[in-house]
């Protein structure tokens, strides 16, 4: 005010809410809650056989989606495969579809920081809450298929097998009009098939 110096004792313009007032705490704790739950989903997936250990099989993934009601059949899919440039191509196609008014899903790999980056809806990574909800839907069925595989003397579902089906469930729940799906390790035995 016209060069007037403010007394250092005067309160700041920024309002500090007293601890326990409830202001802002609910949103923060809810965000933290879902982030921690999503981290638990990621940990459960990472505890499985790694995605770079390809098992030449599709039947376990087929069994899992069958028990879930084939969520991947709810939307159209553009399947992107190749040696190089899959993620870029997937992103270009997904953006073009969005520009034409379609609700899109995008499945790419790898993620850099957080698992959610692999699964995007309308160009944005899926929320922690959506990831957790889909996981809660499929986890009991994953256990059933793992038990069936163990009874047949086969290894459990791998990281990528479960992730592919988790993605199918996330996109069905959204729901999306079209999924642009990047092949994981590629080839005939890729779980995205």
Where are these regions (language model features)?
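N-terminal leader/targeting and accessory segments in enzymes
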Residues: 3-4, 10-11, 17, 22-84, ...
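ATP-dependent carboxylate-amine ligase catalytic core
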Residues: 33, 37, 52, 61-73, ...
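Low-complexity, compositionally biased segments
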Residues: 5-12, 149, 193
């Amino acid at each position: 005010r016209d060069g007037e110096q403010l007394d250092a004792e005067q309160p700041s313009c920024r309002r500090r809410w007293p601890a326990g007032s409830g202001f802002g705490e609910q949103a923060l704790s809810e965000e933290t809650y879902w982030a921690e739950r999503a981290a638990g989903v990621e940990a459960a997936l990472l505890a499985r056989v790694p995605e770079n250990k390809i098992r030449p099989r599709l039947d376990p993934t087929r069994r899992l989606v069958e028990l879930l009601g084939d969520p991947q059949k709810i939307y159209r899919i553009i399947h992107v495969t190749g040696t190089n440039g899959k993620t870029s191509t997937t992103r270009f196609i997904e953006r073009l579809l969005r520009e034409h008014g379609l609700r899109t899903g995008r499945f790419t790999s790898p993620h850099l920081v957080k698992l959610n980056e692999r699964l995007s809806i309308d160009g944005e990574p899926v929320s922690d809450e959506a990831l957790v909800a889909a996981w809660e839907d499929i986890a009991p069925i994953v256990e059933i298929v793992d038990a069936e595989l163990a009874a047949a003397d086969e290894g459990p579902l791998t990281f990528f097998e479960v992730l592919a089906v988790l993605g199918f469930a996330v996109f069905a729940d959204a729901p999306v009009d079209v999924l642009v799906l990047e092949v994981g390790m590629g080839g005939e035995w890729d779980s995205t098939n």
